[in-house]
Swiss-Prot record:
The chain crosses the membrane at residues 11-31, 69-89, 159-179. GO terms for biological process: cytochrome complex assembly. May interact with CcsA. Pfam families: ResB. InterPro entries: Cyt_c_bgen_Ccs1/CcsB/ResB, ResB-like_domain. Keywords: Cytochrome c-type biogenesis, Membrane, Thylakoid, Transmembrane, Transmembrane helix. This is Cytochrome c biogenesis protein CcsB. The keyword 4Fe-4S does not apply. Belongs to the Ccs1/CcsB family.
Length: 426
């Protein structure tokens, strides 16, 4: 059992686990996550991922939901256990040892330490008192006994690794909590439409109304930014906010992102008809961003034409059944004859693509990052220990340091010079 615990808490095992988790995260970034199973089968049917895995194998290995897969969560749990065992077996004893006063009573013991010096003096007890005063003035903690003393400084540096491990564990717990208990919803909303979010009991939790949606474009017509004007209603309280790409809205644990855009409907007139608002649908086989509809031009449904559009500014292309381009229409432009019927497009209605995420683990993740940063800062503090023994006209001093021993070896002679000066003046 002890050998198993020692193996689990080994630093090399933790490094391998971190590498595997990083590799899995890279795979989760490269492969789209959370899509319908059929889309993976179709996407990797002719071109396997990395030339190795087809769609069925991607699904079997749970690569379509890496971050919630059993094997990924097992890696996180294993790493968390390794950190806990490492803290228990190594870091906590190191902190206790740094806080424990060790009493060296023989100068020969000090000579075996990493740094050792001797200061000749006429009165060793007086020199010891001067050394004690110098250390106290520079923030050292002291314990004095008869003809000897022990001092330490920077014990907080031993707390740093424990805090780093604690922060990592909190971060992983927050990430797992978010994956298992969080929710994600993607919806396209046309202006004037409402999305109701329900609680687990089926009650309305919050109602989101899209009041307006705007696409900012450059002079060449390329989209630069998407903006949605949202109105939220919750228990009689209302909130109006604008969201855009990289500027989400956070409200009571729910984050609303401006994620995408689409075209929802086209408003047109055919002959003397009233304005007709007809829904558009995507045609990915014609292009990445192509929307359209099939419209009959005769009362019996015959002689249809196909209307296609790529953005809300137009133009609207009208094709015959054989694929011939008949004409172009522009929103707000004049009517154009299409197979004997005057047709006019009033407007094209864009839709806002909203991504709603509820991640209860986010506060825990932020707390974990904060604890890690504090621990990382404390870990930079060197833990130093000094012992001094007054004996027969000599002040024997020895010390230990867990990092930057070179700087400590330069500091000790400086402390002794200050001690000698204080001793002479005293």
């Amino acid at each position: 059992m002890k050998r198993l615990i020692a193996w689990l808490s080994d630093l090399r095992v933790a490094i391998v686990l971190l590498f595997l988790i990083a590799l899995a995260s890279a795979v989760g970034t490269a492969i789209p996550q959370g899509d319908a199973p059929r889309s993976y089968v179709e996407a990797y049917a002719t071109r396997p991922w990395l030339g190795l895995l087809n769609g069925e194998q991607v699904l079997q290995l749970q690569l379509d939901h890496v971050y919630s897969s059993v094997w990924f969560l097992s890696l996180l749990a294993w790493l968390g256990l390794a950190l806990i065992l490492c803290s228990w077996r190594r870091q906590w004893p190191a902190l206790q040892a740094a806080r424990r006063w060790i009493d060296y009573s023989n100068p020969r013991q000090l000579s075996k330490l990493a740094i050792a010096e001797s200061l000749p003096c006429t009165d060793s007890n007086s020199a010891l008192q001067a050394f004690s005063t110098v250390l106290s003035q520079q923030g050292w903690r002291l314990e004095r006994k008869d003809n000897r003393l022990a001092a330490r400084k920077g014990t907080a540096g031993r707390v740093g690794p424990l805090l780093v491990h604690t922060g990592l564990i909190l971060l992983m717990l927050g990430a797992v909590w978010g994956v298992l208990a969080g929710n994600r919803l993607e919806r396209f909303l046309a202006p004037g439409r409402t999305l109701d979010l329900l609680s687990r009991d089926g009650d309305s939790q919050v109602s989101i109304l899209l009041e307006a949606f705007q696409v900012d474009r450059d002079p060449a017509g390329r989209a630069e930014q998407f903006r949605s004007q949202l109105h939220l209603e919750e228990n009689g309280n209302s909130l109006d906010r604008e969201i855009s790409v990289n500027h989400p809205l956070r409200h009571r644990g729910i984050t609303i992102y401006q994620a995408d855009w689409s075209l929802a409907a086209i408003t047109l007139q055919i002959g003397r008809s009233p304005q007709l608002q007809l829904a558009l649908r995507s045609f990915p086989e014609l292009g990445e961003q192509v929307w359209g509809l099939v419209l009959p031009t005769r009362p019996d449904g015959s002689e249809p034409v196909f209307l296609s559009v790529e953005n809300e500014q137009g133009p609207i292309n009208i094709f015959d059944t054989d694929g011939t381009l008949l004409t172009l229409l522009r929103p707000g432009g004049p009517a154009v004859d299409v197979k004997g019927l005057p047709m006019r497009v009033n407007s094209v209605l864009p839709a806002s693509g909203l991504l709603l995420k509820r991640d209860p683990g986010v506060p825990l993740v932020y707390l974990g990052f904060a604890v890690m940063l504090i621990g990382g800062g404390l870990s930079l503090i060197a833990t130093r220990q000094l012992w001094a023994i007054a004996s027969e006209g000599q002040l024997h001093v020895g010390g230990l340091c867990n990092r930057n021993l070179t700087a400590f070896s330069k500091e000790l002679p400086s402390l002794l010079r200050q001690t000698a000066l204080a001793h002479q003046q005293g």
